[in-house]
């Protein structure tokens, strides 16, 4: 059976990164380097920023450096209660420009000029802001202690009044995880990560219901999974050993289980495992030696295992993870 529903075109203009609020009543989007909120019931548009300008100010969408180096474009996020929107602002006014010829349908090429910092040149100046929808007011997060830095990740936690941000120095060997009060915009460092070479920025940060969080780190010489409380105190190391966690698949809160891929059965092999958040009851979900990779269903009950080896072409199998049986 199916239900037929009507699709409604909301805008007669192009928008970037339209994102529903958690309560489904609003849509945040970017247009012309500014941020807006569309209320579905009233069809009203509320403008969050007004200073957006090409090759000068970008609000809520990343610049070239962030898109290429940190692999994300949408630089805004809804709070869990749909009352606030946090966003990153990029001031690229002082960034050097690069021009290139664009060969379109015309007889002659046109010139496109955009901001492009090369090594050693000025990056965009970034700042973090929290917009309160009911008050139509914005607060800037004080990051004055940092100099020439990146806001490599930004997301609200499960607590609707706590925003997280990962601030990375330009050398990329020192990262602070910040928790920011949604009302005052006051920030505190809850975790620091240093590395002699560089700190790898990932999307592995996972918040639990009590706002404790899962974090991956190479601090013991190997990439492993850790559990911290909501204040950034280490509760326990989930995985350990002289091997690498090569992919973190996620956490199932119902079964209190973490899923990951690692090199536990040999550095040239990849196997898929589940483990309790306590670090106990580890199980191998893949049973063939070679390269295994998993894609899990949203509830982690099923997964597609992709397997290959020197003697086996890529093979896909649908499996039960057995965690809810």
Short names for language-model regions:
Residues 1-5, 323-325:
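Conserved small/polar residues in nucleotide/adenosyl-binding loops
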